[in-house]
Design a protein with these regions (language model features):
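Bacterial N-terminal signal peptides that target proteins for export
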Residues: 1-9
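Bacterial N-terminal signal peptides
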Residues: 8-17
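Boundary at the C-terminal end of the N-terminal hydrophobic targeting segment
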Residues: 19-21
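Short helix/turn-capping signatures at newly exposed starts of structured segments
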Residues: 26-27
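Signature of long, low-cysteine stretches enriched in small and polar/charged residues
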Residues: 30-59, 91-134
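Surface-exposed amphipathic alpha-helical segments
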Residues: 32, 42-45, 85-101, 139-174
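Solvent-exposed loop/turn segments at secondary-structure junctions
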Residues: 75-78, 124-125, 146-149
Length: 174
């Protein structure tokens, strides 16, 4: 009897902590100088990678079996970009990098910035992404989820929360 009560209490504590974890407040991610904000379920893992022609900043968080990704990269000022060409190249490179096939793609705009929304899939995963180009900066947000998982609400919340912000320095000056 004592074992059943202990097991019941343990199960109740586990369920309570899972419910609490799912209901906790999301974190607003607004990196200094990044020019965007987005909500994520946890503090993301941040990485910076510098190459000869660009610098990439990435922010990755997980919720259940879904990964939520926000990246921005700045091309060198010497790079001359065509927005439409860059959007398609980014889409194709993303899908090629994860060995996924394109399912849908459409042009979008947000705050006057040209963008592309696309979805893709491989044998096990679904990919959704939005990419925007403004000058020599590219912003991209993406979700990666397992097929059959019902985590669309988290991905929708993530995508809906993305907003552009003024790019400022450490003192809040443009």
């Amino acid at each position: 009897m004592l074992k059943q009560i202990s097991a019941s209490i343990l199960l109740l504590l586990l369920l309570t902590s899972l419910i609490h974890a799912q209901q906790r407040e999301w974190v607003k991610v607004a990196p200094l100088g990044a020019g965007f904000s987005v909500m994520m379920p946890t503090r993301p893992t941040e990485a910076v990678e510098s190459k000869e022609l660009f610098t990439l900043h990435s922010f990755v968080a997980a919720t259940g079996t879904t990964l939520l990704i926000a990246v921005y990269f700045d091309y060198a000022p010497s790079m001359k970009m065509n927005e439409a060409t860059e959007l398609v190249a980014n889409r194709d490179s993303f899908l090629r990098g994860v060995n996924a096939r394109l399912i849908s793609s459409k042009e979008i705009k947000l705050d006057g910035r040209s963008g592309l929304e696309f979805t893709g899939e491989d044998e096990r995963r679904l990919y959704k992404s939005r990419v925007y180009v403004f000058g020599n900066r590219v912003h991209q947000i993406a979700s990666v989820s397992l097929k059959g998982d019902d985590e669309t609400g988290n991905a929708e919340r993530f995508f809906a929360s993305f907003a552009f912000a003024a790019i400022t320095d450490g003192q809040g000056k443009p």
